[in-house]
Regions:
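Short aromatic-glycine-(Arg/Gly/Cys) micro-motifs in beta-strand/loop hairpins
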Residues: 1-21
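Mixed-charge, polar/low-complexity N-terminal
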Residues: 5-7, 29-30, 69
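Compositionally biased, intrinsically disordered low-complexity regions
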Residues: 16, 28, 62-64
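A short, charged, amphipathic alpha-helix used as a generic interaction element across diverse proteins
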Residues: 29-42
C-alpha cells in the first residue's frame, strides 16, 4: 500500500511538492515545512513522524535532501 503522503523530488528551485492521495497540500523548502503542511491538514503533532514510511513516501531523497534538481 502506498503511503498517504508523498514528498516529491526537489524542483529546480529546491521546493518539493507535498501531496496526499494526488491532492496538492503545498510546496515545502524544508522538513519543517512538510511538518507544518501536515499539521495544517489536521494531523496531530504526535502522529507525524517524518521518517515513517507508512505515512510518508520520500521521492528523490529523504527529509535531508533539499538541493535544487540538476539543470535548474
Amino acid at each position: 500500500m502506498t503511503p498517504p503522503i508523498v514528498v516529491h523530488p526537489p524542483s529546480a528551485s529546491g521546493e518539493r511538492r507535498v501531496t496526499a492521495h494526488t491532492e496538492l497540500l503545498g510546496l515545502a523548502r524544508s522538513a519543517q515545512d512538510v511538518f507544518a503542511l501536515l499539521l495544517g491538514v489536521g494531523l496531530k503533532e504526535q502522529e507525524i513522524q517524518l521518517d515513517d514510511p507508512a505515512l510518508i513516501e520520500w521521492r528523490g531523497g529523504g527529509p535531508e535532501e533539499w538541493r535544487p534538481a540538476p539543470g535548474g
